[in-house]
């Protein structure tokens, strides 16, 4: 930012650092303007990062403008390719998988089909040593007690409550209300209150202990089920999860979100069969089979877990096939921007 500091700058730098360290990137090129407040050199120092063959930086002003910048950028990326291309696939444990849990365009079926099915998949992942990140704090509001009672220790539960209180104050000073979250699409899909929405949303987290609560874009170091404080807006929320280390996004939708993510593939889970028939090209799994009576939550959870393993092994998700996600880097903008 040109004139941004404090919390907003801290969050931006943390987010950029998380992407720079992300395992789904073979190499990273960081390009700055040259006179911005978030200087590349100070960002590197603050983040504990060092330039190397697979982390290159430069700025536009020192490079002589747009054309020279593009030419230099292409040359630097090409120089990374030989080392990046040496990487070979090899068998590894599911413990290396970190899923970012998302829901967007929720409906009245979300809490009884796709969300609990995703929760069942989360339980399987956690049993294999993996990690799942629940986020979208405003959509936990009113159901936080279901999470605090699962906290591994008192401090974890208290940190979640502190983040809820922060959101109450944050929305108040900005003229909003925490209890008025459902969107027009949510209401058209049968959700009328934040409590209905939140009770369904927390089902994505399965049944295991809540092991840690993180602030936005903080590195997730704890294995198991954790929570990261983010807004409910999907691109901002997922950006924080990816910065924290999520290498796959599992996204439930009842109304038909076509969201995609990069560098972490997004697996789309339809809550109802009508949506599946309408947008099959965007959806990866039809959790509406639970509502139809042709599959159980546990069976669908196993199917989701199997797809997570397949996508982690290189099978492209529907949103990847469409090329979605290249424009979905949206850090949370906090504080004054002058």
Give residue ranges: language-model regions.
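Metallocofactor- and cofactor-centric catalytic cores in central/energy metabolism, strongly enriched
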Residues: 1-248, 252, 257-338
């Amino acid at each position: 930012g040109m004139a941004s500091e404090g919390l907003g700058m801290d969050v931006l730098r943390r987010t950029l650092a998380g992407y720079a360290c992300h395992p789904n990137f073979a190499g990273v090129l960081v390009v700055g303007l040259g006179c911005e407040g978030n200087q590349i050199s100070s960002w590197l120092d603050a983040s504990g990062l060092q330039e190397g063959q697979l982390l290159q930086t430069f700025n536009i002003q020192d490079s002589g403008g747009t054309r020279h910048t593009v030419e230099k950028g292409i040359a630097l990326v090409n120089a990374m390719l030989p080392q990046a291309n040496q990487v070979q696939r090899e068998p590894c444990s599911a413990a290396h998988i970190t899923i970012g849990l998302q829901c967007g365009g929720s409906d009245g079926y979300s809490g009884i089909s796709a969300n609990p099915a995703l929760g069942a998949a989360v339980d399987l992942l956690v049993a294999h040593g993996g990690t799942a990140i629940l986020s979208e704090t405003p959509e936990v509001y009113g159901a936080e007690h279901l999470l605090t009672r699962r906290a591994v220790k008192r401090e974890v539960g208290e940190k979640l409550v502190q983040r809820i209180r922060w959101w109450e104050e944050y929305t108040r000073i900005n003229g909003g209300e925490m209890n008025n979250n459902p969107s027009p699409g949510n209401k058209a899909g049968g959700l009328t209150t934040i409590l209905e929405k939140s009770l369904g949303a927390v089902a994505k987290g399965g049944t295991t202990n809540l092991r840690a609560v993180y602030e936005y874009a903080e590195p997730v170091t704890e294995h198991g089920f954790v929570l990261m404080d983010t807004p409910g807006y999907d691109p901002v929320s997922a950006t924080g999860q990816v910065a924290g280390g999520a290498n796959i996004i599992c996204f439930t939708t009842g109304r038909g979100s076509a969201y995609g993510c990069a560098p972490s593939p997004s697996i789309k889970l339809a809550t109802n069969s009508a949506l599946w028939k309408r947008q099959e090209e965007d959806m990866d799994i039809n959790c509406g089979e639970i509502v139809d009576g042709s599959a159980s939550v546990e069976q669908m959870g196993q199917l989701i877990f199997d797809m997570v393993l397949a996508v982690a092994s290189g099978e492209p998700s529907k949103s990847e096939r469409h090329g979605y996600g290249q424009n979905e880097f949206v850090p949370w903008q906090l504080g004054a921007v002058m």
